Curated annotation (Swiss-Prot):
This is Type 1 phosphatases regulator YPI1. InterPro entries: PPI_Ypi1. Signal peptide: none annotated. Residues 1-17 have a biased composition (Low complexity). Residues 102-113 have a biased composition (Basic residues). GO terms for biological process: glycogen metabolic process; intracellular monoatomic ion homeostasis; mitotic spindle assembly checkpoint signaling; regulation of protein localization to nucleus. Belongs to the YPI1 family.
Amino acid sequence: MQNQQEEISSTQTTTIEVLPPVLQLRASRDQPSRHDVRWGTDVIDNENMNKKKTKICCIYHPQDEDEEGCTSDHQHEEPPESSSSSSSESENDKDLGFDERRKRRVERRRRKLRDNTDSAPNAYEVQPDYSEHRKKMMEKKSNNT
């Protein structure tokens, strides 16, 4: 009777390997490669001359030739010491390390900017206002149609 009460159970494990899907990208050979610039509607027409721009130009601030980073090979004639208008701090810069020269250079630039705060910015630093010009151009377009 004991044989009858025993149940025979068996389990079977099946392992299925699932490979990740592979995506292959191929360039289309039908379309020729064209690199056209497409300007957005927010791009400004520079004084109606069909010159488009997206932002104000960068302003290059040249370094003084006495400062670190001047890589030119030519030699400059030293001005006589009596006519030198530079302060004693720039004469001592040659004896200082890179970090100290940089700190002094930055401080001179800040001082110069602070002293020149009353001067007006140049034309490259101010975005021109073309709103009146745009209105006139829109009126011309509407009158022509």
